[in-house]
Every structure is written in structure tokens, then in C-alpha cells.
């Protein structure tokens, strides 16, 4: 998840290490704090593998600042991860948010739609945070306390909103509408706050009580 975020933000634009950390923290810091001891070793590994390079550039003060750039190898790796994500990238909500933040960097609407369809298929499976003795998913109406009712009601509403968005976006992409494409890097930081504001989310039980 961290390497995908690094690749994605550097695909948006070259960044200094501090700026990269700030963007990653906004996108996924609510899941796991982005510490220097995690980020910079990852950057070094990716530099050693040829996926990014560092260039010294003049800073505001006397000391030069190192700017990170994605290489062609890094761009190819990003596109591979976006086009063929792991199953966990589809099913885990937090990993999905990171993937979704950079899906615009796939050039083909058909490739974008294929990834969204995998998420749609996952969400359409009946699931819940709670099951009865027969392993049947339980809905909010089956609980007498307001807390489990609230958990399942919120999860259901979140899931229904995502399902509606997925279906509409897949339909638009399959019609060849390319407005969801990569665009420019001008709004590179725009999506970061969205992930943070969404919070951890309901996780694997997000379609709880759908009753579909």
C-alpha cells in the first residue's frame, strides 16, 4: 500500500520527500502513521530497483533539496499494480482507497472499468459483521441495541453509495467517456484529503444488511 502511494503521487508530479510524506499521510495516515523509518527505507528500495531517482535542486535556503522523480520503470510498475491489483487491494477498504486514488493513471477506460467491476463484484456478495448460527449474514433490524444497529446501518449506507457510484462509473467508462482519465498533475493533492476524511470505514462488512 505504501509503495503504491509513493508511485502514484510521484506519477502525479515530482516531489520532495517532505511533500511526499505529507500527501501520503493525508491519504492513508488514518490507517497507519507514516514514519520516517517506514517511508525513507521504502524510497531507498525503490531507488535501488530503478523505479525512482533523486535529483538535487536548489532550495530556498543554501542547502539543495532532493526531488524524487518516477522513472519509466516506476511508471510501468504503477500501471501494472493498477491494472492487475491483488485481491486484498480490492477487498480491503483502506487499500482500495489508495488504489482508487491513482486509477486515473490507467490510460484505457476499459482497464479502469475492469478494476471497478472487480470491486463491484466483491461488494455485491452478501456479507455482514455478524452471522447467525447458520452462517447467514445478519442485518441491523435483527439487533436490539442501537450500537450494532448503528454499525450495520452506517455500513449499509456506505456500501449502497459506493455500489451506485461503481455502477454509474463503469457504465460511463464502457460508453467510452474518458473524463475519468489521468488528466494532469494539477490536482495531485486534491484526492488526499478525501481518503483521510472518509476514515477507516466499515471494512469487510460494508454491505451488511443489504438484503439484495
PLM feature spans:
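Acidic interhelical loop/turn segments
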Residues: 131-151, 181
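Basic helix-turn-helix/winged-helix DNA-binding cores
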Residues: 1-92
Amino acid at each position: 500500500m505504501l509503495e503504491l502511494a509513493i508511485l502514484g503521487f510521484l506519477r502525479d508530479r515530482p516531489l520532495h520527500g517532505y511533500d511526499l510524506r505529507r500527501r501520503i499521510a493525508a491519504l492513508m495516515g488514518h490507517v497507519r502513521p507514516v514514519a520516517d523509518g517506514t517511508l525513507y527505507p521504502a524510497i531507498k528500495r525503490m531507488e535501488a530497483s530503478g523505479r525512482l531517482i533523486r535529483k538535487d535542486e536548489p532550495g530556498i535556503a543554501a542547502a539543495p533539496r532532493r526531488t524524487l522523480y518516477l522513472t519509466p520503470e516506476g511508471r510501468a510498475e504503477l500501471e501494472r499494480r493498477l491494472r492487475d491489483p491483488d485481491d486484498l487491494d480490492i477487498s480491503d477498504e483502506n487499500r482500495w482507497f489508495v488504489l482508487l486514488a491513482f486509477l486515473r493513471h490507467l490510460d484505457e477506460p476499459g482497464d479502469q472499468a475492469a478494476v471497478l467491476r472487480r470491486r463491484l463484484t466483491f461488494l455485491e456478495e452478501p456479507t455482514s459483521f455478524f452471522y447467525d448460527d447458520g452462517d447467514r449474514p445478519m442485518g441491523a433490524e435483527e439487533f436490539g441495541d442501537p450500537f450494532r444497529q448503528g454499525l450495520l446501518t452506517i455500513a449499509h449506507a456506505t456500501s449502497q453509495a459506493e455500489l451506485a457510484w461503481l455502477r454509474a462509473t463503469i457504465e460511463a467508462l464502457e460508453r467510452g467517456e474518458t473524463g475519468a482519465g489521468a488528466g494532469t498533475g494539477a490536482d495531485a493533492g486534491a484526492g488526499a484529503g478525501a481518503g483521510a476524511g472518509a476514515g477507516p470505514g466499515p471494512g469487510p462488512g460494508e454491505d451488511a444488511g443489504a438484503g439484495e
